[in-house]
Amino acid sequence: MNKYASEHKEIPGNPSTAKSSSKKLNDRQNRSPLRVLTEKQWSFWVQKGYIVIKKAIPKKQAEATATFLWEFEEKNPKDVSTWYKPPRAEMQMKELAGTGMVEVYNNQYLWDNRQTQKVYDAFVDVWGTEKLWVTIDRANLNFPIKKGFEYKGFIHWDYDPETKPQNVQGVIALSDQTDINMGGFQCIPWLFQNYDLWKLGQPEDRNRFQPDISGIEKYIEKVAMEAGDLLIFNSLLPHGIRPNLSKDKVRIAQYISMMPAEED
C-alpha cells in the first residue's frame, strides 16, 4: 500500500504535489557527498528554501521543449495575435486561469528533461536518496498582461504549512527569464524562515494556503533564470507566479519534482 498521506483535497497550486512524503528531506547526517550542489549552494538551500541549478538541461533541449509547447498550444511565438487564444484544455483549477498553464504531461520532450542526469542528481542531493519517483507535471506559457487578460499573481503554499510537509517542487526554465518584469517564480524566504513567529499575529481562521502578506511584501524575491536552469524549492516556502509586465516577452517553463519511492 502506498504510504503517501494526502494532506488536503483542494489546493491552490500544483496538483501533483498534493501528497507529502513519509521520508524526510536530506539532513546530510549520512555524510554522503553532494552530486550537484556546492557547499555554498547547500547553505543557501537550507536558509532560503530554494536553489537554482544552472544549466541543468542543455539550452538546445530547453529550446526544443519550448518550441513543442508553442506548437501544442497552436500559437506562434512571432505572432502576438495568436497568444491570447483560449488554451487547448480548460483549467480545472480556476485560480490558475490566465497564468498560462499548458495541460500537457507525457510528451517525450518533457520526459527527456525529467530523465536528464543533472536534474536527477539535484533531487538526489536535496532528498539524500537515489530511489526517487518523478512527478508528472504540466508546463507554462506566461504571456504579457493586457486588457482582458489580467493576472495579479498570488503567493501561496500547495500544502497547509501547519502539517509540516516533507516535499519539494521545481521548475525548469525553457526560456531566459532574466528580466524580472516578464513573469516567473517569486517567493518569500523570510516567511519560510519566520513562519512560527509570523503566525502568532494571524487569525485562527486564516486561509492556510494563501497567506496575508500585508506588511511583508518587501521580502518577496523575484528569481531570475536562464533557459536550462532548474529551480527546486521546499514546499514550506510560500511562492507564486509573478505577473508578466513586459511588453513582448513570454515566460516558458516546465514543472518538475521528484520524491522518495515508497515500497509496497
Where would I find each of the regions flagged by the language model?
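A short hydrophobic beta-strand segment most commonly corresponding to one strand
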Residues: G170, K249-E263
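Double-stranded beta-helix
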Residues: E73, P77, Q177-R242, M259-D264
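Short beta-strand segments enriched in hydrophobic/aromatic residues
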Residues: L174, L237, M258-P260
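Non-heme Fe(II)-dependent double-stranded beta-helix
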Residues: N2-Q47, K54-E162
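Secondary-structure boundary elements
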Residues: D125-W133, E162-P165, A173-N181, N194
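Short acidic/polar capping segments at secondary-structure boundaries
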Residues: A139-K147, D160, L174-D179, W190-N194
